[in-house]
Amino acid sequence: MFKTLTQNLMKIFDRLVSSGLLTEEQIDAALRDIRVALLESDVALPVIKNFVAEVKQKALGQEVIKSVSPGQMIIKIIHEEMINILSSSEDEIKLNLNAKPPVNLLMVGLQGSGKTTASGKLALCLKNQNKKVLLVSLDTYRPAAQEQLEILANSVKINSLPIVKGEKPLDIVKRAMAEAKLSAYDIVIYDTAGRTQIDQEMMNEAIAIKKIVEPTETLLVIDSMTGQDAVVTASSFNEQLEISGLILSRIDGDSKGGAALSVKYITQRPIKFLSSGEKLTDLEEFDAKRIASRILDMGDIISFVEKAASIVDREQAEKTAAKLKKGKFDLNDYLQQMKSIKKIGGFGSILSMLPGSGKIMDQIDQSKLNSKIIEHQEAIILSMTPKERRNPDIINASRRKRIALGAGTTVQKVNILLKQFKQISDMMKKASNMNPKNLLRSGLGKLFS
């Protein structure tokens, strides 16, 4: 999501750090470059003006002039100001569920923003907190919209209100409220009709629904790929519906990232969640410090560890670690690692959370980060015999031909896999004695080049 902005900022930071003592003129030049980088990333102009002014005021302070490394100090100030723009209090970010059950949550947004999928993701998140959740679709306008929510609910074993054809949205609300009380639901999530544009008639319907439902949260789902249009959308919904928070969707897309920096500042409403991908597990609580670190290429190791911990089999990981200590790492272990990487979100997702990754992303063949590559490699390894997986060195030309035939691929692809396995195996042996940033550059950079 922040790739372009991150890479542009990294070039500016490299110049700052390479300079010794910085003059006011150099600081002004750097801030002009930062302004351009933010504009190119679709950050709203009021946000840019405030951000640059705050950074300049602090950068020209005595604490910077006396600093041993003024370039690093300015980067620190930029990091802090980015956190200030994005952050809200802990109470604001946390979902407000403080009401007598059933607690009502209202989801609003433009059509195509990912609102229905976000509703399903939020429902699963709450279900995992041992809440009894009911999903209710109020979208009687878009073909199959109600069925879409029903399918999502069924896929994760969450109840959805049965569909009654021809029923009006306000009547659906009344039926849902009665069902929620009768069946003792903890939380009801209402997925309102998406609007193709900010339409007053549809907005009035949402206002009427909110008046009846009295939700503890009115959450606006914003497509992060819409750029500066996101600010217009957020402002309009906030003015008329008094939203309580934001969910940014499609953060894994090829967007410029400006929406994240703009919508919170303009609406003064907290970003509560980030949504990526189509999997209902792809929802993360928003953390300003972590996102600011990602933007400035400082990595987000905490999110990476949390995601890995929720997915990776601890017992299997301990077995692999024990084998590595003995200098043993075979294709069975490699296969397990590939499966874990796929669950976490693939190589691209992992790289985006590692410090310094922004500088090597341009050097990496992006097509090789595709999850399909992992699936192809799984097929190749599964076409090997148990003996071959334990002892890759015995895989000669004739064996490679047989493996390729069994996997429905070419000998060249088998050769590539074995080469990558060798590189990773060597990396594993060096990892304990190498700085993580150096490992990233020397290892992963070569692996995907």
Curated annotation (Swiss-Prot):
Major localisation? cytoplasm
Read off the InterPro entries from this record: AAA+_ATPase, P-loop_NTPase, Signal_recog_part_SRP54_M_sf, Signal_recog_particl_SRP54_hlx, Signal_recog_particle_SRP54_M, SRP, SRP/SRP_N, SRP54
Subcellular location per UniProt equals:
Cytoplasm
Q: Which Gene3D superfamilies match?
A: P-loop containing nucleotide triphosphate hydrolases, Signal recognition particle SRP54, nucleotide-binding domain, Signal recognition particle, SRP54 subunit, M-domain
Task: State which Enzyme Commission number(s) the record gives.
Answer: 3.6.5.4
Which annotated residues bind GTP?
A: 109-116, 191-195, 249-252
Q: Does the keyword RNA-binding apply?
A: yes
GO CC term (a single one) = signal recognition particle
Q: Where are the transmembrane segments?
A: none
Provide the catalytic activity annotation: GTP + H2O = GDP + phosphate + H(+)
**Any one GO MF annotation of this record:** GTP binding
Q: Name one GO biological process term.
A: SRP-dependent cotranslational protein targeting to membrane
Q: Which UniProt keywords apply?
A: Cytoplasm, GTP-binding, Hydrolase, Nucleotide-binding, Ribonucleoprotein, RNA-binding, Signal recognition particle
Spell out the Pfam families in the cross-references: SRP54, SRP54_N, SRP_SPB
Q: Which PANTHER family match?
A: SIGNAL RECOGNITION PARTICLE 54K PROTEIN SRP54, SIGNAL RECOGNITION PARTICLE SUBUNIT SRP54
Q: Which family does it belong to?
A: Belongs to the GTP-binding SRP family. SRP54 subfamily.
Task: State the domain notes.
Answer: Composed of three domains: the N-terminal N domain, which is responsible for interactions with the ribosome, the central G domain, which binds GTP, and the C-terminal M domain, which binds the RNA and the signal sequence of the RNC.
**Could you tell me what this protein does?**
Involved in targeting and insertion of nascent membrane proteins into the cytoplasmic membrane. Binds to the hydrophobic signal sequence of the ribosome-nascent chain (RNC) as it emerges from the ribosomes. The SRP-RNC complex is then targeted to the cytoplasmic membrane where it interacts with the SRP receptor FtsY. Interaction with FtsY leads to the transfer of the RNC complex to the Sec translocase for insertion into the membrane, the hydrolysis of GTP by both Ffh and FtsY, and the dissociation of the SRP-FtsY complex into the individual components.
Q: How does it assemble?
A: Part of the signal recognition particle protein translocation system, which is composed of SRP and FtsY. SRP is a ribonucleoprotein composed of Ffh and a 4.5S RNA molecule.
Q: What is this protein called?
A: Signal recognition particle protein
What is the native source organism of this protein? Rickettsia bellii (strain RML369-C)
Gene name on record? ffh
